[in-house]
Structures are given as structure tokens and as C-alpha cells.
């Protein structure tokens, strides 16, 4: 997975505008961001509120355009107006609140909204809707009202709506922030399967450290800049730096740290609860 699908080069973005007298009531949200999203990978982007991660997400399918630098999606420059529809066909977006993306009174009609606006034939639309609902495990709910679904189910409908557009890449901006733990697990499992089984490129924006553990790579942002990039194991092994960026460590990493502080000789490479349990079992099953 070394072939970049999306490339950000020196991307800067500010909210607001400069005043005529030279005063600049602007907030720099991105400051010279360089990033590549590799074809077929699951990339997690972490950061505190205000770190720039959501602003960056909106640059990946040209919802926002850089004030400086450029973003290339499958070789297409997002600054070129002629490329916008092609880019948005390639990169689907899912946002934090699924209610803001639901536009129809019936699940299958909501999923069909995008393909209908592409002017596709009815048979093609039906096939895409069926395929997308099957992919997120929502086929049996196709005739229900979205507003009667749980939060996790609504988010799966929003993901199906994006999938019906047949994107090569899915960008999800804190898709589990408004969900309970079971809803979070449900949505993450669906997206992991899309990545692993269908090869879909995934960019997952989150502030939940345990979600980032399943990614191929992790990007940590602060103050509009990329601060760290690496595998989850590489990034979370740098506990002091993570804390300096005012982020938490994954639960298993925290637990292993506390046990080591009590004298339990655990390896520093532990990342998941399963790994922690296995290490403890090996340690205490020795004769």
C-alpha cells in the first residue's frame, strides 16, 4: 500500500478574511500540511478539538480549497473547478451527525438520493441501493423510516448513501462522536470490513484512541500541523509525546503502563486489550 491516492502538499487554510487596514481577523486552521493517503489503507487522523483534523477532512474531497498548497485526488487537483465532480465521485464523505445527511423518509429512498441526482437509470439505482445496504448490514431496514433507527443504524444508512455513489475512498469525520459504545463498535466494524474485504481506502477522523488502534497508520494533528505519523504501535509507544499533545493513550496502553509502574514486567509494545490479556496469561502461567 505505497501508492498515494490522495496527496496534500503544503496545505494551509484560514477561516475569516483579512481586513483592508492590514489587520487579519483570521484563524489559521491548517498550516503547511503535508500528507499522503495510500490506496487501500485505513488511515486514522487524531487530534484535539481545533487541531485542524476536520478542516483537513473537508479538503480531501474539495468541500474546502486550500489558500496555499494543493490537494491531489487520484492525480486531480482540487483547485481546478472542472475536476470537482470527478473528485467527489471518487471521495465520499460521512459526517458526525447522521441526521444532517438523511434527506428522505424511507431508508432505501435516502440511499438512492445520490445516484438519482447523478441521473442514473432506475435499474442501476436499485442495484446500487441494494448493494450499499447489504454492505452495511441494513438490507432488512430498507423500508423503515431512518428516524426510527438507532444512532448506529442511522450512521450506517449515511455510510450506505456514500457507498451508493461508488467512491474509491471514504472520509469519515468523527462518525462515532454522537454514538453510544455499542453504536461506535457497530459503525467501526462496518467500515473496517469495507476496507479489509472490498479494499476501500478509508480516512477515519476521531478523538477516540481505541478506534485508531485498528488503523494501518495514524496521523496526529495539533495547531493545524501534522505532529506525528506512523503505525498505531509506533505512535502510541511515544506516550510522553502523546500526552504533551493533550491526548489520551488507548485503554490497553494505559493499563499496561500502570501495571509496569507496579513492577509487572510487561512489554512496551502492547496495544490492544487482547494483547494485554495474552501477555498477562503468559507471564503468570509460567512454572
From Swiss-Prot:
EC nos: 7.-.-.-
Domain of life: Bacteria
Keywords: ATP-binding, Cell membrane, Membrane, Nucleotide-binding, Translocase, Transport
Bilayer topology annotation: Peripheral membrane protein
GO BP term, pick one: cobalt ion transport
Molecular-function GO terms, alphabetical: ATP binding; ATP hydrolysis activity; ATPase-coupled transmembrane transporter activity
Annotated positions binding ATP: 47-54
Main location: membrane
GO cellular component: ATP-binding cassette (ABC) transporter complex
The ABC transporter domain, residue ranges: 6-248
Pfam families hit by this protein: ABC_tran
Location relative to the cell: Cell membrane
Similarity comment: family membership: Belongs to the ABC transporter superfamily. Energy-coupling factor EcfA family.
Description of how the protein assembles with itself and partners: Forms a stable energy-coupling factor (ECF) transporter complex composed of 2 membrane-embedded substrate-binding proteins (S component), 2 ATP-binding proteins (A component) and 2 transmembrane proteins (T component).
The protein's role, per its UniProt record: ATP-binding (A) component of a common energy-coupling factor (ECF) ABC-transporter complex. Unlike classic ABC transporters this ECF transporter provides the energy necessary to transport a number of different substrates.
UniProt-recorded name of the protein: Energy-coupling factor transporter ATP-binding protein EcfA1
Lineage: Bacteria, Bacillati, Bacillota, Clostridia, Eubacteriales
Amino acid at each position: 500500500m505505497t501508492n498515494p491516492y490522495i496527496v496534500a502538499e503544503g496545505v494551509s487554510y484560514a477561516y475569516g478574511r483579512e481586513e483592508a487596514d492590514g489587520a487579519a481577523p483570521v484563524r489559521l486552521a491548517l498550516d503547511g500540511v503535508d500528507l499522503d493517503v495510500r490506496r487501500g489503507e485505513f488511515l486514522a487522523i487524531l487530534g484535539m478539538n481545533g487541531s485542524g483534523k476536520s478542516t483537513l477532512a473537508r479538503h480531501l474531497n474539495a468541500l474546502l480549497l486550500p489558500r496555499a498548497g494543493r490537494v491531489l485526488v487520484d492525480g486531480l487537483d482540487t483547485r481546478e473547478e472542472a475536476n470537482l465532480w470527478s473528485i467527489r465521485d471518487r471521495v465520499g464523505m460521512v459526517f458526525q451527525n447522521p441526521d444532517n445527511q438523511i434527506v428522505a423518509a424511507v431508508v432505501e429512498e435516502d440511499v438512492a438520493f445520490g445516484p438519482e441526482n447523478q441521473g442514473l437509470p432506475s435499474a442501476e439505482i436499485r442495484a446500487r441501493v441494494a448493494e450499499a445496504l447489504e454492505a452495511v448490514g441494513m438490507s432488512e431496514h430498507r423500508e423503515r423510516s431512518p428516524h426510527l433507527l438507532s444512532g448506529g443504524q442511522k450512521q450506517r444508512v449515511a455510510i450506505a448513501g456514500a457507498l451508493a455513489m461508488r467512491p474509491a475512498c471514504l472520509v469519515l469525520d468523527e462518525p462515532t462522536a454522537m454514538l453510544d459504545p455499542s453504536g461506535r463498535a457497530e459503525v467501526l466494524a462496518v467500515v473496517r470490513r469495507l476496507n479489509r474485504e472490498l479494499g476501500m481506502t478509508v480516512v477515519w477522523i476521531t478523538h477516540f484512541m481505541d478506534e485508531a488502534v485498528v488503523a494501518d497508520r495514524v496521523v496526529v494533528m495539533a495547531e493545524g500541523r501534522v505532529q506525528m505519523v506512523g503505525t498505531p504501535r509506533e505512535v502510541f509507544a511515544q506516550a510522553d509525546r502523546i500526552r504533551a499533545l493533550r491526548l489520551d493513550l488507548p485503554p490497553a496502553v494505559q493499563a499496561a503502563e500502570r501495571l509496569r509502574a507496579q513492577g509487572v514486567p510487561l512489554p512496551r509494545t502492547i496495544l490492544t486489550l487482547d494483547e494485554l490479556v495474552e501477555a498477562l496469561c503468559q507471564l503468570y502461567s509460567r512454572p
